[in-house]
Amino acid sequence: MLIANPIYDTVFKRLMENKRIARFFVETLIGEKIEDIAMMPHDYTYHAKVSKNERKKETVEDSKQEWEILSIIRFDFVATIRTTDGNSKKVIIEIQKSSKPTDLMRFRTYLAEQYKRRDVVEVASGKVEKALPIICIYLLGFKLTNIQSAAIKVCRNYIDMVSQTEIKQKNEWIDALTHDGYFVQIPHITGKPRTSLEKLLSVFEQKYFFDEKNTLKDYEYPIDDDNLKMMVEMLKHAASDAKTRREMEEAWWADENEKEQERLEKELKETAKAIEEKDKTIEESRKSLVEKDKTIEEKDRTIEEKDKEIEELKRQLKK
């Protein structure tokens, strides 16, 4: 089956805007039952500048004619989770997707924004402001150092520091100041899927592409889940949609242009550093020559003084 590559922001955004797919995606990743999920009024994107008129730039100056393409995409949801003890709790689900490890500080900035939020929730006595717990999901288009797992969960444990035992009870105040994190390393997604999580991740596997831009791929794994089927069908439709394919191609060129600009900037820095090193070597050579000239002058003066002494001795001997 021909489907659109969901790592492209325009495609992933379409998936997350579908409530059923978003619920299935989050529920499968965090491994908890979600009773309800709603996207918050905005999604945040970081925009990278790319050339509007040229596919490839010869110099960094060429990047002055630009347009904007998404570099980071972020979605925020409010979800009601059914806990293992049968109770319900509201949480904020933050999903961030990026292809570069250099986006770490942006991730931290977005997280700080969430901690500053004041959410209004319904309670028995009416509406109240409340700091909801946060769950972060990061989709990474790069590999983390020394970790080969495709999906990683970093969770909080309450530990009694005196007895060194785990505390099973949870506290809303503590939960509001800490959060669980889920990390998906897209480059490590590979192999035949077996579990529900692996089947979901298999959609993001970066293999079996039809073109060099990696916009379209062949998905041939068995589908035995209605939600997964709906997700794949949406990707199939996106693959045949001219507007979506054009947006994916533009994003691919944006990425290529950004890589080229980074290469040129790196090349310019290396050239500047090499020139600086050469200038330093030339300056050191100049100083060395000056020192040698001084040494020669001193030797000449010494010889001149000795010659004078010899002449004086000769005059004295003639007397």
State where each predicted segment sits.
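Non-catalytic, well-ordered alpha-helical scaffold segments
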Residues: 9, 19-23, 105, 134, ...
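Generic amphipathic alpha-helical segments used as scaffolds and interaction surfaces in large
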Residues: 12-17, 187-191, 218-222, 226
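A residue-level signal for conserved active-site and pocket-lining positions in enzyme catalytic cores
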Residues: 26, 137, 184, 231, ...
